[in-house]
Regions:
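Vicinal oxygen chelate
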Residues: 9-10, 31-35, 65-70, 89-90, ...
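Polar low-complexity intrinsically disordered regions
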Residues: 1, 20, 24, 74-78
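Post-signal peptide N-terminal segment of secreted/secretory-pathway proteins
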Residues: 31, 40-56, 62-85, 93, ...
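Short, flexible turn/loop "capping" segments at secondary-structure junctions
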Residues: 1-2, 80-81, 153-157
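Eukaryotic phosphotyrosine signaling hubs
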Residues: 5, 83-87, 160-161
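Short N-terminal amphipathic alpha-helix/helix-capping patch enriched in small hydrophobics
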Residues: 4, 15-18, 126
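Core segments of cupin and vicinal oxygen chelate
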Residues: 10-62, 115-118, 165-201
Length: 201
């Protein structure tokens, strides 16, 4: 069973600029850097990434889930318009304050903060990052009320706890996770996602 996210990868047209933005506005710190080994690039079926520079960043405190930024990316990339991994969801302390802090940065505000359900337990905001990657910045008032029950983070901007995936066939995707990883599944649940709706307006 898959239990914890250890690291996520994003492609960046400018790794140095991305590092600075994550450091200045998310409070993340660089923990390593290097180039993508050919063997690894082949293993993930992305041979074009072999030899590309990367750096890995972690939140200041709390659970250490890395974001590995790899040189690459498509200038025409648009979040939510491709299948596969679409967004990174981070636990944050105060979405309202974070919205103010991100003004004038390379992070562009999209929606929120808004409560996602009538229970008013999950307050979330969506922003796009320096390379158009989509972030959900989420605060749970009481994590014990969520079926995920994530470990709280003491950092203003904490760790990745959800990855959002676009799928052309939800049933097939759920069956894949059930068959190969024995993960518990919830849903599918009908739900209107504002940033997804706007992407196709």
């Amino acid at each position: 069973m898959l239990k914890s996210i250890l690291m996520v990868w994003v492609l960046a047209q400018n790794v140095v600029l991305t590092e600075q933005a994550y450091q200045d506005y998310l409070g993340y710190r660089k923990v390593d850097e290097g180039v993508v080994p050919t063997e690894l690039a082949r293993a993930i079926e992305r041979p074009d990434l072999a030899g590309r520079p990367f750096m890995t960043m972690m939140p200041a405190t709390g659970p250490q889930v890395g974001i590995r930024v790899v040189q690459g990316g498509d200038q025409g990339y648009q979040p939510m318009k491709r299948v596969g991994w679409s967004a990174i969801e981070l636990l944050v302390e105060d979405p309202e304050q974070l919205k103010r802090n991100l003004q004038g940065s390379l992070f562009r505000h999209l929606q929120g903060p808004d409560f996602l359900t009538d229970e008013r337990n999950i307050l979330a905001m969506q922003v796009s990052g320096p390379n158009q990657q989509l972030f959900y910045l989420t605060h749970m008032l009481d994590p014990s009320k969520s079926f995920l029950q994530p470990e709280p983070s003491p950092a203003q901007v904490g760790h990745t706890f959800i990855m959002v995936m676009g799928s052309p066939d939800i049933s097939a995707s759920l069956e894949f996770w059930r068959t190969y990883f024995s993960n518990d599944l919830v849903g599918p649940i009908p739900y209107r996602i504002g940033v997804l709706s706007e992407a196709y307006d």
